[in-house]
């Protein structure tokens, strides 16, 4: 999962962010959040060689927050198509295309709002206060979903969750990096391992439990949405408890905006934007697997496989399990083996990943054609599609994130992070808009329902991958390493 993601893929960024903050000259000064608040450390202890004391609070917070988000997301589209009520207490569910449209619009908002989170954090409030304030907003979003099962509760809840979840995304991982100085920077890989584990563990458990609560008549939507809300409240309290343990890097004001609009900054973003257009199409497909259209398809599958019985919303559990297996497999086995025959670089990995993503949708397209013909295919076929999709994620998402940071000027790391997340927003905005247009397209003779829907995305991804191969050959970038002069380099080096 992108718990991503996008937080889960940050080993490079954590180290870059640490060096970035420590390379800027700052005079230690106190931050007060109230008239009687104690003074907080504003720079890492460079002599500290053990784990920073605030790290356990950040890891606990992240695991609980990811539980809340992915638990809610795993049941969202099924709630809209099966359980949604009107103000009179009667069922008023959405059609599949309408539910998919709102689902992707919500995901698009979640990954658009990190831009504002980065601006608020870096320019005004700092990371700690930004995370605390927006986490409270996040909690109220879960409360609205749990307490009101009408469209009012749905849209109010999703709006608040998008603001809270999206706003804190660029802050949390940077806050981890802020805790480390030169004396303990060697512990970053270990911290990232626990950080990454907490994210995937939280998403795995919630994706398993929340569908059970939703489908059990003793509980239903109120408990299914209430459990993620409770975990978000716990996440907020845990983070607040660590306030005296954290290093609080002060906001730098809006001076970084000048760097953003400098010639070098605009040129770097312009170069990355060429790659990001293709990555946005990747996310347009990927997010259909995480509680979206693939979950709706799973409702029509034979959910018994290898002695196990799945709920439709639980099939997506395959992704976090597989990504944990694939990252070491790709890094230590597959990439070195391919590199001996065909030299790999960042853009080549991304290109291969785009083709693999298309292959996953070939499987989904075939499954849907069997369903449309009256069949009931085994869920094992969708699990095969998850294997291919997760392989493409390892090649595109992780590689693209690390590539972005090395291509970003040293003072623009946070903004480039927000720009990377914006590709997710663009991809989901496209998918959401397309779903809303399906009824109108039908009236004009264009059928994008059933197997034709997945056929469209399969061809879209294939065409995108082919064009990317040619465009990537002409990409020339500049690599920026903290503490060193920027180096002209081919993008793939």
Protein language model regions, located:
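Hydrophobic core of transmembrane alpha-helices in multi-pass small-molecule transporters
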Residues: 152-168, 374-395
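Intracellular loop-helix junctions on the cytosolic face of multi-pass helical membrane proteins
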Residues: 7-57, 181-189, 193, 198, ...
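A gly/Pro-rich, aromatic-decorated transmembrane alpha-helix motif that marks the paired
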Residues: 74, 115-116, 201-213, 425-441
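Short amphipathic helix-loop junctions that connect adjacent transmembrane helices
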Residues: 74-98, 292-312
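C-terminal ends and interior cores of transmembrane alpha-helices
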Residues: 136-150, 356-373
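Intracellular juxtamembrane helix-capping segments at the cytosolic ends
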Residues: 167-182, 395-408
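Central cavity-lining transmembrane alpha-helices of secondary-active solute carriers
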Residues: 104-119, 317-330
């Amino acid at each position: 999962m992108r718990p991503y993601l996008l937080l889960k893929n940050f080993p490079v960024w954590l180290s870059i962010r640490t060096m970035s903050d420590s390379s800027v000259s700052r005079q230690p000064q106190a931050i007060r959040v109230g008239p009687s608040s104690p003074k907080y450390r504003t720079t890492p202890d460079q002599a500290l060689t053990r784990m920073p004391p605030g790290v356990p609070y950040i890891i606990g917070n992240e695991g609980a927050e990811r539980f809340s988000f992915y638990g809610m997301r795993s049941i969202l589209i099924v709630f809209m198509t099966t359980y949604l009520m009107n103000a009179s207490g009667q069922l008023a569910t959405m059609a599949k295309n309408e539910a998919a449209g709102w689902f992707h619009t919500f995901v698009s908002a979640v990954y658009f709002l990190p831009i504002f989170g980065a601006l608020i954090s870096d320019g005004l409030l700092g990371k700690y206060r930004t995370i605390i304030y927006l986490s409270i907003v996040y909690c109220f979003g879960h409360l609205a979903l749990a307490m009101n099962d009408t469209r009012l509760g749905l849209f109010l809840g999703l709006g608040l969750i998008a603001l809270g979840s999206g706003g804190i995304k660029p802050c949390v991982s940077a806050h981890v990096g802020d805790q480390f100085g030169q004396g303990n920077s060697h512990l970053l890989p270990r911290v990232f391992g626990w950080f990454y584990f907490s994210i995937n563990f939280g998403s795995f458990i919630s994706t398993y439990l929340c569908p059970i609560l939703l489908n059990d008549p003793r509980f239903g939507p109120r408990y299914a949405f209430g459990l993620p809300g409770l975990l978000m409240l716990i996440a907020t309290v845990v983070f607040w408890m660590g306030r005296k343990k954290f290093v609080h890097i002060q906001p730098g004001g809006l001076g970084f905006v000048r760097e953003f609009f400098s010639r070098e900054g605009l040129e770097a973003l312009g170069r990355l934007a060429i790659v990001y257009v293709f990555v946005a199409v990747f996310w347009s497909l990927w997010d259909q697997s995480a509680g979206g259209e693939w979950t709706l398809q799973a409702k029509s599958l034979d959910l018994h496989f290898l002695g196990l019985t799945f709920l439709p919303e639980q099939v997506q559990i395959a992704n976090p399990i597989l990504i944990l297996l694939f990252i070491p497999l790709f890094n230590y086995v597959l990439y070195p083996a391919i590199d001996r025959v065909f030299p790999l670089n960042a853009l080549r990995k991304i290109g291969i990943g785009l083709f693999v993503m298309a292959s996953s949708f070939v499987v989904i397209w075939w499954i849907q054609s069997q369903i449309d013909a009256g069949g009931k295919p085994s869920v094992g076929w969708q699990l095969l599609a998850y294997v291919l999709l997760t392989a493409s994620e390892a090649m595109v998402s992780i590689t693209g994130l690390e590539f972005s940071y090395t291509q970003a000027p040293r003072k623009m790391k946070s903004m480039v992070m927000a720009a990377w997340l914006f590709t997710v927003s663009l991809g989901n905005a496209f998918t959401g808009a397309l779903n809303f247009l399906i009824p109108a397209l039908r009236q004009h003779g264009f059928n994008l329902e059933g197997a034709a829907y997945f056929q469209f995305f399969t061809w879209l991804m294939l065409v995108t991958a082919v064009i990317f191969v040619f465009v990537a050959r002409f990409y020339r970038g500049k690599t920026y390493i903290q503490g060193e002069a920027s180096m002209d380099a081919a993008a793939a080096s």
